[in-house]
Amino acid sequence: MDDPSFLTGRSTFAKRRRARRMNVCKCGAIMHNNKDCKSSSISSHKLDRLRFVKEGRVALTGETPVYRTWVKWVETEYHIYIVETSDDED
């Protein structure tokens, strides 16, 4: 991910190439990119994972760090909008 030039395209080819490079499945899974994936929607568990990534994630030893552009791309591609609510409403 040293070369961010592949993030700029909006064509179908660019989206497929981006998904291949980032290992993002059509179902929104972060860790796999299966062509025959049978999942169709993003679960609340995956939304929680994305929220955790967005709020801050520490890369452990031997782990690939998660970049903000990647999180933004996943949110945009799968129409995920995390609404911040305050718990102080009375």
UniProtKB/Swiss-Prot annotation:
Pfam families on file: Viral_NABP
Entry keyword Glycoprotein: no
Any single GO BP term: symbiont-mediated suppression of host innate immune response
InterPro entries to which the protein is assigned, alphabetical: Viral_NABP (IPR008891)
Family that this chain belongs to: Belongs to the carlaviruses nucleic acid-binding protein family.
The protein's role, per its UniProt record: Suppressor of viral-induced RNA silencing. The potential mechanism of action is based on sequestering siRNAs.
Segments of this protein annotated with the region Basic: 15-18
Name of the protein: RNA silencing suppressor
Gene Ontology MF terms: RNA binding
Keyword RNA-binding part of the UniProt annotation: yes
Record keywords: Host-virus interaction, Inhibition of host innate immune response by virus, RNA-binding, Suppressor of RNA silencing, Viral immunoevasion
Domain of life: Viruses
